[in-house]
Amino acid sequence: MNKVFGIVGWSGSGKTDLTTRIISYYSQKKIIVSSIKHTHHDFEIDKEGKDSQKHVRSGANEVILYNEKKWALISKLQQKSTSIYKILEKFEKKNQLILIEGLKHSKFPKLEVIRSSIKKPYIYKNDANIKAIVIDQEISDIKLSKLPIFKFSETENIGNFILEYFKR
C-alpha cells in the first residue's frame, strides 16, 4: 500500500490551507503526491444540467468524467459506507505519498492542526496516531506535549517531518 499520512483538526483550523501548501512543496520537490479530502457532507462534483449529471440522474451506477489529461469517477455502488482502504486502492502505485485531509479518527499516522481561537478538545490527547502538532500561535498547555510542534507557517519543516516519518 502507498504511504499515507493524515492532516486533522477541527473545522476552521486551517487543514486545507496547510494541506495545499504541503502538496505544493512536494510538487516542487518532484515528489509524486496525491490527496483525499474527507467530508461529512453530501457533495456533487457535477453541475446542474451537465451531461454527466444527466447520466447519474437517469440511473447510471457509475459515471466517469474523462479527457486525455484527467478523469473522475462518480459511484453509487457502495455498501452502507465505503472504507478508506477501498478508496486508497484506487490510487496509482507510483504515488510516493497520499495525504488525507480530515478523517480524524483514522488509524493512519497524522498531525493535528490547532488554531488557538477554536475552543475544542485537543485530538492528540486521546489519539496515539497523532505524530506532530501544528499551531497558529503559542499555546501554553500544548508545550507540555512530547510531540513535535510546528508553527503553521513552517510548511517545509512539516513536509520534511512527514517524509522523515516514513524513513523510520
Each predicted region: which residue ranges?
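N-terminal phosphate/diphosphate-binding loop that engages ATP/GTP or pyrophosphate donors
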Residues: 23-79
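Conserved lysine of the Walker
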Residues: 15
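Walker A (P-loop) ATP-phosphate-binding motif of ABC ATPase nucleotide-binding domains
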Residues: 4
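Phosphate/Mg2+-binding loops and adjacent switch elements
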Residues: 97-151, 155-166
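Hydrophobic anchor at the beta1->P-loop junction of P-loop NTPases
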Residues: 7
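The conserved Walker
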Residues: 11
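Phosphate-binding/switch loop-helix module in NTP-utilizing enzymes
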Residues: 75-105
